[in-house]
Amino acid sequence: MAQSALVTGAGGFIGHHLVKYLVDKGYHVRGADIKRPEYAPTSGQEFEVLDLRRFEDCLIAARGMDEVYHLAADMGGIGYITENHADVARNNVLIEANMLEAARIHGAKRFFYSSSACIYPLYLQEQPEVTPLKESDAYPADAEPGYGWEKLYGELLCRYYLSDHGLETRVARFHNIYGPEGTYDGGREKAPAAICRKVALARDGDEIEVWGDGEQTRSFTFISDCVEGIYRIAQSDYPEPLNLGSDELTTINNLVDVVSAAAGKSLIKRHDLSKPQGVRGRNSDNTKAREVLGWVPGVSIADGMAHTYRWIEAYMQRVGAVPAGVA
């Protein structure tokens, strides 16, 4: 009989891709989310539209599942999470606590939790040429307001459910996941998708808006690398949080250049210093993931962004979002 897995957040970007990955592995997969996938039908055998802030809905979602992959969260890009600290923190704490308890009640064998690099202390991320963050850097804690603190609390809840109830929890700290079929507009999009959208809408020689001075640095992880890492972490015997990210550091300005090159356009950057830009620099130290999992990301930022841009441009053209004459 096939192993069964629940993927919460299956209507979202990472969850949607993870469902397909697990189905291809031979799992019977149930997706659960407050919405269905936006850009393509789910690959899973089941999909439940549920509000996981409600404990009763979490019990429905987790019933009969061998493994739980918990990705559901109220989140978005830097603009959204900096303007909605209270809602983000409250909603996500409810979802996390409810899903852990529902998994325990229904006897799930494993529980994967998607944490975030936003848990890392702000005092370690004040320079663009940042030292890559290793897992032990999380404490003394000084997480990002709202989203970062609630993700750190979620990690602690997982630790308590492992120690108190024997639920085999596994934790990944995501570093800026991107790729096709991710939200690219509406206010919840992340920087890679937002840049792809802006470039797709621009004519050769146009200006495009860049939030901040563009010299803030990040590492970005392609979705195929992410879902492979999720599975390896979930199936491992390692109970502590692990970074799941690329260690290829880039500036936001360079990200714009990479996408512009993929589009064959020469564009002028117009920097808006009034917009939120997050921490000054962040990169992932993948030493522990290599040691424990043998996992290394395989997709470069140039290849991943080109692939992402082509998907966003094609989708926008298909729905009529790209004006005539823009190519």
What are these model-derived regions, one by one?
Residues N92, A143, Y147, K151:
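Active-site YXXXK catalytic motif of short-chain dehydrogenase/reductase
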Residues A97-E144:
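Conserved Rossmann-fold NAD(P)-dependent oxidoreductase catalytic core, especially the SDR/UDP-sugar
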Residues Y21-D24, L50, L201-A327:
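C-terminal substrate-binding subdomain of Rossmann-fold SDR/epimerase-dehydratase oxidoreductases
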Residues S43-F55:
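Rossmann-fold cofactor-recognition segment
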Residues A5-K25:
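N-terminal Rossmann NAD(P)H-binding glycine-rich loop of SDR-like oxidoreductase domains
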Residues Y123-P132, G146, L156-A234, D247-L249, ...:
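NAD(P)-dependent short-chain dehydrogenase/reductase
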Residues L52-N91, A102-I105:
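NAD(P)H-binding glycine-rich loop region in Rossmannoid oxidoreductase-like domains
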Residues Y27-R36:
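Conserved glycine-rich Rossmann-like NAD(P)H-binding loop of the short-chain dehydrogenase/reductase
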